[in-house]
């Protein structure tokens, strides 16, 4: 069983925590992480792109010139895809890009992402972050003390002081434990969890 040091918000050691091997010591399979990240990114796509076919274009009802006798190529509509201002052939239409990934696979991928960050020593557990008021400057001071740059900070419950103080800092993303996902973990250089969030996560993923 792995253990991890617990720090306070000034980065002083205040204890340690045992990490469940079934959550933080699972074999990492890149293909599963890739599948889940692809699924997350696909679900984010709006899919509202659209082009008009010749039938959707306004006008083009009258035949431009008679069928025979002009010496020109025959034409039936000014909205043919061959014409400037005509419709588009096989252009994109609105669609849903999302695809299903089984819950067990998503859960396994989350464990793999956590294992990966722990093995790379890019994970930190902090006892608590306590701010006296909502102020970005106060959170910046904590982030600098902890050495955070491009970091994902995970809290157990939505704390308004923390959420509002951290939301305007470039490179810092703060989410609750139940929002934790594979894409955010892998995108961030550092994963920082409050102690109660780490405990809650372990219990849920065991």
From Swiss-Prot:
<dbReference type="InterPro" id="IPR002136">
    <property type="entry name" value="Ribosomal_uL4"/>
</dbReference>
<feature type="region of interest" description="Disordered">
    <location>
        <begin position="44"/>
        <end position="87"/>
    </location>
</feature>
<dbReference type="GO" id="GO:0019843">
    <property type="term" value="F:rRNA binding"/>
</dbReference>
<protein>
    <recommendedName>
        <fullName>Large ribosomal subunit protein uL4</fullName>
    </recommendedName>
</protein>
<keyword id="KW-0687">Ribonucleoprotein</keyword>
<dbReference type="GO" id="GO:0005840">
    <property type="term" value="C:ribosome"/>
</dbReference>
<comment type="similarity">
    <text>Belongs to the universal ribosomal protein uL4 family.</text>
</comment>
<keyword id="KW-0699">rRNA-binding</keyword>
<dbReference type="GO" id="GO:0006412">
    <property type="term" value="P:translation"/>
</dbReference>
<comment type="subunit">
    <text>Part of the 50S ribosomal subunit.</text>
</comment>
<keyword id="KW-0694">RNA-binding</keyword>
<dbReference type="Pfam" id="PF00573">
    <property type="entry name" value="Ribosomal_L4"/>
</dbReference>
<dbReference type="InterPro" id="IPR013005">
    <property type="entry name" value="Ribosomal_uL4-like"/>
</dbReference>
<dbReference type="GO" id="GO:0003735">
    <property type="term" value="F:structural constituent of ribosome"/>
</dbReference>
<comment type="function">
    <text>Forms part of the polypeptide exit tunnel.</text>
</comment>
<dbReference type="GO" id="GO:1990904">
    <property type="term" value="C:ribonucleoprotein complex"/>
</dbReference>
<dbReference type="InterPro" id="IPR023574">
    <property type="entry name" value="Ribosomal_uL4_dom_sf"/>
</dbReference>
<comment type="function">
    <text>One of the primary rRNA binding proteins, this protein initially binds near the 5'-end of the 23S rRNA. It is important during the early stages of 50S assembly. It makes multiple contacts with different domains of the 23S rRNA in the assembled 50S subunit and ribosome.</text>
</comment>
<keyword id="KW-0689">Ribosomal protein</keyword>
